[in-house]
Swiss-Prot record:
GO terms for cellular component: chloroplast. The lineage of its organism: Eukaryota, Viridiplantae, Streptophyta, Embryophyta, Tracheophyta. This is Ribulose bisphosphate carboxylase large chain. Keywords: Calvin cycle, Carbon dioxide fixation, Chloroplast, Disulfide bond, Lyase, Magnesium, Metal-binding, Methylation, Monooxygenase, Oxidoreductase, Photorespiration, Photosynthesis, Plastid. RuBisCO catalyzes two reactions: the carboxylation of D-ribulose 1,5-bisphosphate, the primary event in carbon dioxide fixation, as well as the oxidative fragmentation of the pentose substrate in the photorespiration process. Both reactions occur simultaneously and in competition at the same active site. The record marks K325 as: Transition state stabilizer. Its EC number is 4.1.1.39.
């Protein structure tokens, strides 16, 4: 009947619409749905669409005051996951009007806000989002992007080199600045505050900023290269975060840093706007991501968090190494690395990309490879990530037997050797070790590094794997 009829009704009657043709303004989502036993996949998919858009558990008379057909999310396709029992990919289309312009916060609150605790589902994972051009255009995106960053730094044709200062907690500001200076002096482009360095009793932020700025300017003067240190502006309040970013700008340093998941998307977007307006680069760390993205059947895949960061704004983001100590399977990692860097990315299920994404010239983000990597990984990293990346060696620089500066020299020599060989047409995948060995002949620092790390590998199976 057309009239209002109270009572509970099945979601799929309203929200499962296999005949629906998606619009180019729709936000499309791919969910991995694991229904409770006895719940049909269509009902589970429809429930996800309903609970993340206009639905509630019962019919309400106020539904008659609006056009549900115009505003409801629709589950338009369901496919079983190969090799998994009782797992399905449910595709949901959301009308653009459901979302506030320029707000990643609102987008996530809508799409993943409530539905993950839903009783009819055993587990739920957001695998991918297609952001329509009309929504992309409401975001500023990265403060500067890859090309502008290269122009600011005057560094071309190679990956950039970084190093996280260790021990991450406990150094005084003066000693911390000294470690920064030695790394930059030795040949690195950047050094980095660890993600949990904010403003603690043993080192307050203002002291750290001051000594790091001194290290930057001294090493710049001595090397003739532009240097940077990611000054972590993450703080307990947005106001305090902005205060730190403003102080960094007053010191004249090139780059600040933010933990975008723990700090939150609202704070991150504010900081990104400030950075563009004031010429600061913005380095993004993904602390807390594994709590959200590590389980294969529940949570949010990192490729979605990466897309969200490109919208919210950041010039660098940590994105796994493929070869080090932290998670990252090659094809999947390269899938979201391309989503960060490229302007147009075709749907490619072999790399976990569920939708074609057009960024309409939104600036790109440099992926940062960091975590358990050292000189022997350099050929693989250069091969996998290409020029537009930041390779970050923490222990792989500071663990050098002769100290930080020689550790930095070793990494820079290894990188230059790999880039030179690649440009000469050599195959880094097969000749990588040979290229590094040749370079050790004219770099005692590299030879010493090769000796220390020759045996270390972190061999565990990746958790994040593709479906068969």
């Amino acid at each position: 009947s057309v009239g209002f009829k109270a009572g509970v009704k099945e979601y799929k009657l309203t929200y499962y619409t296999p005949e629906y043709e998606t619009k180019e303004t729709d936000i499309l989502a791919a969910f991995r749905v694991t229904p409770q036993p006895g719940v049909p996949p269509e009902e589970a998919g429809a429930a996800v669409a309903a609970e993340s858009s206009t639905g509630t558990w019962t019919t309400v008379w106020t539904d008659g005051l609006t056009s549900l057909d115009r505003y409801k999310g629709r589950c338009y396709h369901i496919e079983p996951v190969a090799g998994e029992e009782d797992q399905y990919i449910a595709y949901v289309a959301y009308p653009l009007d459901l979302f506030e312009e320029g707000s990643v916060t609102n987008m996530f609150t809508s799409i993943v806000g409530n539905v993950f605790g839903f009783k009819a589902l055993r587990a739920l994972r957001l695998e991918d989002l297609r952001i329509p051009i009309s929504y992309v255009k409401t975001f500023q995106g990265p403060p500067h992007g890859i090309q502008v960053e290269r122009d600011k730094l005057n560094k071309y044709g190679r990956p950039l080199l970084g190093c996280t200062i260790k021990p991450k907690l406990g150094l005084s500001a003066k000693n911390y600045g000294r470690a920064v200076y030695e790394c930059l002096r030795g040949g690195l482009d950047f050094t980095k505050d660890d993600e949990n360095v904010n403003s603690q009793p043993f080192m307050r932020w203002r002291d750290r900023f001051l000594f790091c700025a001194e290290a930057i300017f001294k090493s710049q003067a001595e090397t003739g290269e532009i240097k940077g240190h990611y000054l972590n502006a993450t703080a307990g309040t947005c106001e305090e975060m902005m205060k730190r970013a403003i102080f960094a700008r007053e010191l004249g340093v090139p780059i600040v840093m933010h933990d975008y998941l723990t700090g939150g998307f609202t704070a991150n977007t504010s900081l990104a706007h400030y950075c563009r307006d004031n010429g600061l680069l913005l380095h993004i760390h993904r602390a807390m991501h594994a709590x959200i993205d590590r389980q294969k059947n529940h949570g949010i895949h990192f490729r979605v968090l990466a897309k969200a960061l490109r919208m919210s704004g950041g010039d660098h983001i940590h994105s796994g190494t493929v070869v080090g100590k932290l998670e990252g399977e090659r094809d999947i990692t390269l899938g979201f690395v391309d989503l960060l860097r490229d302007d147009y990315i075709e749907k490619d299920r072999a790399r976990g990309i569920y939708f074609t994404q057009d960024w309409v010239s939104l600036p790109g983000v440099l992926p940062v490879a960091s975590g358990g990597i050292h000189v022997w990984h350099m050929p693989a990293l250069t091969e996998i990530f290409g020029d537009d990346s930041v390779l970050q060696f923490g222990g792989g620089t500071l663990g050098h037997p002769w100290g930080n500066a020689p550790g930095a020299v070793a990494n820079r020599v290894a990188l230059e050797a790999c880039v030179k060989x690649r440009n000469e047409g050599r195959d880094l995948a097969t000749e990588g070790n040979e290229i590094i060995r040749e370079a050790t002949k004219w770099s005692p620092e590299l030879a010493a590094a090769c000796e220390v790390w020759k045996e270390i590998t972190x061999n565990f199976a990746a958790v994040d794997t593709l479906d068969p």
